[in-house]
Protein backbone atom coordinates (compact mmCIF):
# COMPACT_ATOMS: atom_id res chain seq x y z
CA UNK A 1 0.00 0.00 0.00
CA UNK A 2 2.77 2.38 0.91
CA UNK A 3 4.75 1.61 -2.25
CA UNK A 4 2.31 3.33 -4.65
CA UNK A 5 2.27 6.73 -2.86
CA UNK A 6 6.07 6.63 -2.48
CA UNK A 7 6.47 5.80 -6.17
CA UNK A 8 4.14 8.65 -7.10
CA UNK A 9 6.00 11.12 -4.86
CA UNK A 10 9.37 9.95 -6.19
CA UNK A 11 8.18 10.29 -9.80
CA UNK A 12 6.81 13.76 -9.11
CA UNK A 13 10.10 14.77 -7.48
CA UNK A 14 12.11 13.55 -10.51
CA UNK A 15 9.86 15.41 -12.94
CA UNK A 16 10.09 18.67 -10.99
CA UNK A 17 13.87 18.50 -10.58
CA UNK A 18 14.35 17.70 -14.29
CA UNK A 19 12.11 20.60 -15.32
CA UNK A 20 13.93 22.95 -12.96
CA UNK A 21 17.31 21.89 -14.37
CA UNK A 22 16.07 22.53 -17.92
CA UNK A 23 14.78 25.99 -17.06
CA UNK A 24 18.07 26.88 -15.37
CA UNK A 25 19.88 25.75 -18.52
CA UNK A 26 17.72 27.97 -20.74
CA UNK A 27 18.02 30.94 -18.36
CA UNK A 28 21.79 30.64 -18.47
CA UNK A 29 21.87 30.18 -22.25
CA UNK A 30 19.73 33.24 -22.93
CA UNK A 31 21.07 35.46 -20.16
CA UNK A 32 18.04 35.46 -17.89
CA UNK A 33 17.92 35.09 -14.15
CA UNK A 34 21.56 36.01 -13.46
CA UNK A 35 20.76 38.85 -11.08
CA UNK A 36 18.13 36.84 -9.23
CA UNK A 37 20.58 34.10 -8.31
CA UNK A 38 23.19 36.45 -6.87
CA UNK A 39 25.65 36.20 -9.76
CA UNK A 40 27.29 39.43 -10.88
CA UNK A 41 25.73 40.50 -14.16
CA UNK A 42 28.27 42.04 -16.52
CA UNK A 43 26.96 44.38 -19.17
CA UNK A 44 28.09 43.59 -22.68
CA UNK A 45 29.96 46.14 -24.74
CA UNK A 46 27.78 48.37 -26.85
CA UNK A 47 27.46 47.65 -30.56
CA UNK A 48 27.84 51.32 -31.47
CA UNK A 49 30.78 53.66 -31.02
CA UNK A 50 29.28 55.76 -28.21
CA UNK A 51 31.69 54.48 -25.55
CA UNK A 52 34.68 55.07 -27.81
CA UNK A 53 33.50 58.58 -28.71
CA UNK A 54 33.00 59.50 -25.04
CA UNK A 55 36.44 58.17 -24.14
CA UNK A 56 38.04 59.93 -27.12
CA UNK A 57 36.41 63.25 -26.26
CA UNK A 58 37.34 62.92 -22.58
CA UNK A 59 41.00 62.11 -23.23
CA UNK A 60 43.49 64.89 -22.52
CA UNK A 61 46.38 64.98 -24.98
CA UNK A 62 48.33 68.00 -26.19
CA UNK A 63 50.18 66.03 -28.85
CA UNK A 64 48.71 63.25 -31.03
CA UNK A 65 45.98 60.94 -29.71
CA UNK A 66 46.29 57.51 -31.32
CA UNK A 67 42.91 56.37 -32.67
CA UNK A 68 43.48 52.65 -32.03
CA UNK A 69 44.80 52.80 -28.47
CA UNK A 70 43.99 56.35 -27.28
CA UNK A 71 47.67 56.73 -26.37
CA UNK A 72 49.15 60.23 -26.37
CA UNK A 73 52.34 60.33 -28.47
CA UNK A 74 54.49 62.91 -30.26
CA UNK A 75 53.93 61.59 -33.79
CA UNK A 76 51.34 59.28 -35.41
CA UNK A 77 53.95 56.66 -36.29
CA UNK A 78 54.80 56.39 -32.57
CA UNK A 79 51.35 54.92 -31.80
CA UNK A 80 51.60 51.50 -30.13
CA UNK A 81 49.77 48.48 -31.47
CA UNK A 82 46.51 47.67 -29.68
CA UNK A 83 47.61 44.05 -29.12
CA UNK A 84 51.42 44.06 -28.76
CA UNK A 85 51.56 40.42 -27.66
CA UNK A 86 50.32 39.23 -31.06
CA UNK A 87 51.07 42.16 -33.38
CA UNK A 88 54.18 43.74 -34.86
CA UNK A 89 54.34 47.41 -35.78
CA UNK A 90 55.76 48.00 -39.24
CA UNK A 91 56.73 51.52 -40.28
CA UNK A 92 55.90 52.20 -43.91
CA UNK A 93 57.85 55.42 -44.24
CA UNK A 94 56.59 58.99 -44.55
CA UNK A 95 55.45 58.89 -40.92
CA UNK A 96 52.96 56.05 -41.25
CA UNK A 97 52.90 52.65 -39.62
CA UNK A 98 50.61 49.62 -39.46
CA UNK A 99 50.12 46.86 -36.92
CA UNK A 100 50.07 43.37 -38.39
CA UNK A 101 49.33 40.02 -36.83
CA UNK A 102 52.39 37.88 -36.24
CA UNK A 103 50.45 34.79 -37.23
CA UNK A 104 53.13 32.40 -35.93
CA UNK A 105 55.78 33.62 -38.35
CA UNK A 106 59.41 34.06 -37.36
CA UNK A 107 60.36 37.41 -35.78
CA UNK A 108 60.38 40.13 -38.45
CA UNK A 109 58.64 37.91 -41.02
CA UNK A 110 55.55 40.13 -41.23
CA UNK A 111 57.70 43.22 -41.92
CA UNK A 112 59.65 41.31 -44.58
CA UNK A 113 56.44 40.24 -46.33
CA UNK A 114 55.07 43.79 -46.27
CA UNK A 115 58.30 45.08 -47.79
CA UNK A 116 58.15 42.41 -50.52
CA UNK A 117 54.53 43.36 -51.24
CA UNK A 118 55.44 47.06 -51.46
CA UNK A 119 58.10 46.18 -54.06
CA UNK A 120 55.58 44.08 -56.00
CA UNK A 121 57.45 40.85 -55.37
CA UNK A 122 54.74 39.12 -53.39
Swiss-Prot record:
Disulfide bonds: none annotated. GO terms for biological process: ERAD pathway. CDD domains: LCL2-like. Residues 1-21 form the signal peptide. Transmembrane segments: none annotated. It comes from the Eukaryota. InterPro entries: LCL2. Keywords: Signal. Probable component of the endoplasmic reticulum-associated degradation (ERAD) pathway. Belongs to the LCL2 family. This is Long chronological lifespan protein 2.
Amino acid sequence: MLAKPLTAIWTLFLLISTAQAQFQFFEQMFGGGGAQQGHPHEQEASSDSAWYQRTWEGAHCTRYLCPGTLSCVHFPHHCPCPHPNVEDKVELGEGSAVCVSRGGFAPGEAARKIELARKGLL
